Amino acid sequence: MYGRGPMWDNRIRNGIPTPPVTGTSSLQYFLDRLAAGVSLPVEGHVLLVHECALKADGVRAARAALKEPYLAICPLSNLFIHNTLPSIPLMRESGIPICVGTDSLSSNDELNMVAELRAVQEAYDVPLGELLGWACLNGARFLGKEDILGTLEPGKKPGIVHIKNLADGKLTEASESVLL
């Protein structure tokens, strides 16, 4: 965020273009760039991914600039790259819908949604039902597919996954998913 450190030095040494150093968060940089190109607030769903540096002012700025923001977290990638998770309590308090993903194998050892959810549950006291809503319904809503995906209801055709090896409603190291 400040234009220093080994990654920055490596980019300079190798002639790789460097992003502008603004001293602001990536979210604020994105919102500032967005405001320079379009009228705010932006209509439609906008997915804000990772947001490990999210603070209350970022939530306020996102709500002001975006009519329908969504947050996407990839917990194991966040831990792999930043050795931290985003502020899940702040995200929950914000009222902005949270989605969960796996990111990619370039920043993760496996693509395993149960492991992603378990990483959140190990760090924060988030009920399993809420986590499943982030993983299923919120993703379907973001994609505009909640009429056919995201929940088990008449007329919908979601994939069905059974999560085995729970302990008192919590995910465990032994928890795994089985596609039904």
Positions of the model-derived regions?
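Short beta->alpha transition motifs characteristic of CBS
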Residues: 1, 165-167
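Histidine/acidic residue-rich metal-binding segments in metalloenzymes
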Residues: 1-70, 82-98, 147
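His/Asp/Glu-enriched, well-ordered alpha-helical/loop segment
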Residues: 40, 84-165
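Active-site beta-loop-alpha junctions enriched in small/polar residues
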Residues: 51-54, 76-78, 103-105
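Short beta-strands and strand-loop turn motifs
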Residues: 71-75, 99-102
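A generic structural motif
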Residues: 76-81, 131
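Short, Lys/Arg- and Gly-enriched loop/turn segments at beta-strand edges
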Residues: 167-174
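Short peripheral tails and domain-boundary helices/loops at the edges of structured domains
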Residues: 178-180
